[in-house]
Amino acid sequence: MSGLLHTTLSGLNSDSYCEISQYRDQHFRGSRQLQEKSLKISSTLYVGNLSFYTTEEQIQELFSKCGDVKRIVMGLDKIKKTPCGFCFVEYYTRADAEHAMRFINGTRLDDRIIRTDWDAGFKEGRQYGRGKTGGQVRDEYRTDYDVGRGGFGKIIQMQKANHQPAIY
């Protein structure tokens, strides 16, 4: 077996995909140790960088390839109640969630590379974006529109592709 292929395949079999990231939910009620313990036994994943147009059905179809999905909670803008680019996927077992971390993290859905991370477990209210404008905090630091997320960027890109003048 070639060196590169062997390295790639052994990487898929490693536990590095299932390690807990450095991110910690600042709204978690409890100590850092309790949060870390919760993350290590959790069967819930945070899924970020979703298109605003990605549907729950698309999430179900993709994530069910790794096991039985218990529920999906789509992230919503807390003011407009529209999708804002993230969701929570809860599996029945930790093993199925680990498969999703290993095989789905970094894949493309709706022309966007999605990222997954462990979540200590969904609690009511967490489905709403935490940014001041209702969406995600991360979106508030963007300097221009994200084409994959919709808004004027999507319209302008389509007009450029069709060589039509943009009207604002």
Swiss-Prot record:
SMART domains: RRM. MRNA binds at Y23, Y46, R115, T116, D117, W118, D119, R126, Q127, Y128, G129, R130, Q136, V137. The lineage of its organism: Eukaryota, Metazoa, Chordata, Craniata, Vertebrata. The gene is NCBP2. GO terms for molecular function: mRNA binding; RNA 7-methylguanosine cap binding; snRNA binding. Component of the cap-binding complex (CBC), which binds co-transcriptionally to the 5' cap of pre-mRNAs and is involved in various processes such as pre-mRNA splicing, translation regulation, nonsense-mediated mRNA decay, RNA-mediated gene silencing (RNAi) by microRNAs (miRNAs) and mRNA export. The CBC complex is involved in mRNA export from the nucleus, leading to the recruitment of the mRNA export machinery to the 5' end of mRNA and to mRNA export in a 5' to 3' direction through the nuclear pore. Belongs to the RRM NCBP2 family. Component of the nuclear cap-binding complex (CBC), a heterodimer composed of NCBP1/CBP80 and NCBP2/CBP20 that interacts with m7GpppG-capped RNA. It is found in: Nucleus; Cytoplasm. Keywords: Cytoplasm, mRNA processing, mRNA splicing, mRNA transport, Nonsense-mediated mRNA decay, Nucleus, RNA-binding, RNA-mediated gene silencing, Translation regulation, Transport. This is Nuclear cap-binding protein subunit 2. InterPro entries: NCBP2, NCBP2_RRM, Nucleotide-bd_a/b_plait_sf, RBD_domain_sf, RRM_dom. GO terms for biological process: mRNA cis splicing, via spliceosome; mRNA transport; nuclear-transcribed mRNA catabolic process, nonsense-mediated decay; regulation of translation; regulatory ncRNA-mediated gene silencing. It comes from Taeniopygia guttata (Zebra finch). SUPFAM superfamilies: RNA-binding domain, RBD. GO terms for cellular component: cytoplasm; nuclear cap binding complex; nucleus. Residues 43-121 form the RRM domain.
